[in-house]
Regions:
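Residue-level detector of short coil/turn "hinge" positions at structural boundaries
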Residues: 36-37, 106, 141
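Generic secondary-structure signature for well-ordered alpha-helical cores
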Residues: 31-35, 100, 139
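Gly/Ser/Thr-rich loops at beta-strand to alpha-helix junctions
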Residues: 15-21, 82-85, 112-118
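Short, glycine/charged-enriched secondary-structure capping and boundary segments
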Residues: 25-27, 90, 121-124
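Ordered, amphipathic secondary-structure segments that act as subunit-interaction surfaces
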Residues: 69-102, 106-109
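Catalytic cores of processing enzymes, dominated by hydrolases/peptidases
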Residues: 115-143
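Low-complexity, flexible helical/coil segments
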Residues: 45-52, 109-115, 140-143
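N-terminal short beta-loop-beta anion/metal-coordinating cradle
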Residues: 1-80
Length: 143
């Protein structure tokens, strides 16, 4: 029997970064699970850009999505990250408030890590029990 790592409602999030790996992965998960957007968030700290799709412009945003009929998973997909640390901090706080209102117990963020050429999954945890659980699942903890 495998050890349960996460609580009853988990958020998996990805935003652009190194190679947009986190964003691409989160977008893929959301599409594969046929997720529906249920909340949008914006930040005044996003880059001064406007995405255009099919001739329609919109603001950069963070989308919260959920697979239809499920209440145990939220997928966070972001168009961009704020440019300055104060804006990053504020957006992170707003995201955490919204996720708490949906009773999210765990947040897993996806990103790339530049360091080795090996195919390895790296992770960090916020408490020792989670660190042990991640290691037990084959995740290499960053030093």
């Amino acid at each position: 029997m495998s050890q349960k790592i996460f609580g009853p409602c988990v958020c998996i999030g990805g935003m652009p970064g190194i190679g947009s790996v986190g964003k691409v992965a989160a977008d893929y998960i959301a599409a594969a699970l046929e997720s529906i957007t249920f909340q949008l968030m914006v930040s005044t700290g996003f880059p001064p850009e406007v995405p255009v799709e099919d001739g329609l412009a919109r603001a950069l945003q963070v989308e919260l999505k959920a697979p239809e009929g499920r209440d145990d998973l939220i997928i966070l997909c972001g168009d961009a990250q704020p440019l300055k640390p104060p804006h990053m901090y504020n957006l992170a706080g707003e995201i955490l408030k919204v996720l708490a209102s949906y009773e999210v117990t765990d947040l897993v963020t996806l990103a790339a890590y530049v360091g080795t050429s090996e195919d390895t999954v790296y992770g960090v945890a916020t408490d020792p029990d989670l660190a042990l659980a991640l290691e037990g699942g084959g995740v290499t903890l960053l030093p």
